[in-house]
């Protein structure tokens, strides 16, 4: 292998490393995984490390990629799709599922109770009442209503330009973008340093620095370690947050009351009444 030059051997070595890591995780060897950028090759039949890890770890468990820095958490409803395929890939079910994953992750992994979610529109001006597209009326708004119906604080759909241009994003704990460029462009524009890609929804805590492989600077001692450092810190924090969140759920206190089936009134468990000492006092 040549330093700074992508080769088939180097690409295969990266895959072997990920496969071994997943094997060790299944054997209980560790709790968190932090990955470095991987140079794709023809043997890499997945669109990105996140999909590869998800499909090889437990395909039935849903996950969502969340871009994280000190100010933003942006998730993507679709991942690595050509722009002309995004609209057909969106559905009420998909957006609802993505919103739930983001909401649950923010509560459990970031320890924010009752987070506020912003859902971005797909079309310019949020479709302009159907003149610029119907996805907002037919798909995105019903998905938001479904999330609200389940007790989730979801708002939108917001036009991306106004949402970020007028700093609406500062009022939310999480943002759901519809496609790659819609989420990545403002994220990178507003990120000074230390951006991380977090794969939420899996039992394995998995983070990665949001950077490319940058092979052209290999061996020059000029690579910035901040994103990798933040990826490691986020993995550690997430592990601790999950312990804190899960601990009270393991042995919950039993109810001191039960509900009667014939009405909604709560009835306390049968407790013998204290005998009135005054009864029979005249005898």
Locations of regions flagged by a protein language model:
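Ligand-binding beta-strand-loop-alpha-helix segment within the catalytic cores
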Residues: 67-97
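Short, flexible loop segments at boundaries between secondary-structure elements
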Residues: 60-74, 200-216
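Short connector loops/turns at beta-strand edges and beta->alpha or beta->beta junctions
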Residues: 71-72, 80-82, 122-124, 210-212
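A glycine-rich helix N-cap at a beta->alpha junction
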Residues: 50-62
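Contiguous, glycine/small-aliphatic-enriched amphipathic segments in soluble metabolic enzymes
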Residues: 1-49, 93, 97-178, 182-189, ...
């Amino acid at each position: 292998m040549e330093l700074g030059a992508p080769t088939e051997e180097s690409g295969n070595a990266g895959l072997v490393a990920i496969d071994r890591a997943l094997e060790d995780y299944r054997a209980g060897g560790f709790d968190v995984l932090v990955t470095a950028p991987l140079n794709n090759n023809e043997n890499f039949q997945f669109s990105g490390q996140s999909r590869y890890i998800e499909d090889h770890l437990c395909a039935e468990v849903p996950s969502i990629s969340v871009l994280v820095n000190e100010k933003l958490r942006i998730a993507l409803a679709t991942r690595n799709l050509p722009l002309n395929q995004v609209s057909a890939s969106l559905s009420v079910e998909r957006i609802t599922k993505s919103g739930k994953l983001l909401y649950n992750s923010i509560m459990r992994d970031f320890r924010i109770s009752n987070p506020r979610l912003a859902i971005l529109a797909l079309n310019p001006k949020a479709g302009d009442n159907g003149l610029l597209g119907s996805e907002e009326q037919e798909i995105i708004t019903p998905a938001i209503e479904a999330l609200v119906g389940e007790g989730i604080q979801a708002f939108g759909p917001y036009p991306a330009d106004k949402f970020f241009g007028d700093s609406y994003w500062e009022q939310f704990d999480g943002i759901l973008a519809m496609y790659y460029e819609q989420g990545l462009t403002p994220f990178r524009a507003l990120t000074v340093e230390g951006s991380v890609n977090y794969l939420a929804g899996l039992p394995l805590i998995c983070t990665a620095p949001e950077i490319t492989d940058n092979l052209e600077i290999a061996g020059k001692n000029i690579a910035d370690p901040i994103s990798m450092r933040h990826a490691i810190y986020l993995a550690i924090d997430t592990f601790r947050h999950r312990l804190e969140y899960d601990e009270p759920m393991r042995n919950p206190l039993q109810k001191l009351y039960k509900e009667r089936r014939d009405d909604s009134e709560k009835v306390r468990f049968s407790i013998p009444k204290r005998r009135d000492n005054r009864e029979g006092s005249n005898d």
